[in-house]
Amino acid sequence: MKYEWRKQEKNLYGVKQTPIIVEVPKQKYILVKGKGNPNEVDFSDRISALYSLAYAIKMLFKIAMKNKTDNEIADFTVYPLEGFWKKVNGEELDKNKLEYTLMIKQPDFITQEIFTKALENIKKKKPDALYDEMSFREIEEGKSIQILHVGSYDEEPKSFEQMNEFARKRDLTIIGDFHKEIYLSNINRTSEEKQKTILRYSVK
């Protein structure tokens, strides 16, 4: 049986273009931190390395489960790329100063041991210094506001304003100086105006 996040986790990923409140539980991620302009090569290199590790984890799990019954999960769909972005308050946006954490969620059944083994395998197969910066950890975002943004990343402020107004009307306060973005579209295959991104703030 194959675990498919689009079908199994509609409460988190089946988002509309209007703000909603969600409770985001503790979840497992592989992640790598970075700083600088997302249009630079370093950013795309981090994404490529992160995806390579994600697929190494998937393949290792499939091999381990190859003799299991049809009723057991033996495969899963790789989750979309996500990222925490540090907000820039009261300043003109300078992309060269952006700080971010790129991540790909992992199913609950992926363990630290599987991550460690997959990391060892990918280092041997595709040596890259970036793998030394990657980690496996659990993150709990808790009560959050999220919205589906359709369009270019430069137009995200319009969606953030909807979220801010939604929060104000409900006396909710945004926690921290960062927000989450979940990239549902393949930017290499999707035109800017059709790109789908989930935007999320933790609130209290």
Residue ranges and their predicted role:
Residues 1-204:
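A solvent-exposed interaction/effector surface
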